[in-house]
Amino acid sequence: YKNVTNSFMKAATLKGLACHTADDAGNIGPDPIFGWGLLNAKKAAETITGNGLNSWVSEENLNQEQSTTFVVKASGTEPLIASITWTDLPGAANNGNLAANDPTKALVNDLDIRIRKNAVSYFPWKLNSNASSEAIQSEDNAIDNVEQVKIDSPTNSEYTITISHKGLLQTGKQNYSLVITGLTSSFSIVPTSSDLTVCSNQNAVFTYNYKQTGTGTTTFSPVGLPVGAIASFNNTSL
């Protein structure tokens, strides 16, 4: 990840990649015995290197009363899977007054992910309160800080992924990590530099990794430049 993006991933990104790319074990989906499955480091690495082409890995921020929408194109040859993971704020401590496996919600900032296609909404996995039962994909998950939506047989078409939240976000915002696999794209741009603050007479150089499949031409254009600013592009920077 450091070699590709020039930065170290957050803990939530590492956790999200590990859960997202794990090989399923035990019951279908997450379960109390195997969790998200068996770690697959090769698939996690391939998800990082394919970022922007057949996968998406990013670190995002959600503000109070905000929702964020991503429109992606599924390859149609493998499941479309989208996951969000976040490091939640500390909740109320369990001082031993709760029974084992007590279902009382401990989540502080409750984020949500949905995938939509036309009028159909796809929900994330949710563990059943009965530990021996399989996880379900038919209702909201208000318990976990890892949410994953999986469409086993998507079509080669566009799907809308929406990230939102319920209730009040403590501190007014919540960082989260997004991982998506099962995508197709003809090119990608992955930033490798941070935000810059410069004076009006200075140049700002933003670097990125540009990847392209096929022989088509990609045209870049700047949007929202300050008055008097001029932008130029090459294969590695703006």
Located regions from the model:
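Short solvent-exposed strand-capping/beta-turn motif centered on an Asx-Ser/Thr pair
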Residues: 75-77, 87-89, 166, 199, ...
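Surface-exposed beta-strand/loop patches in noncatalytic accessory domains
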Residues: 103-143, 231
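Hydrolase catalytic cores
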Residues: 1-28
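Acidic glycine-/aspartate-rich tracts in secreted/extracellular proteins
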Residues: 23-26, 87-89, 119-120, 168, ...
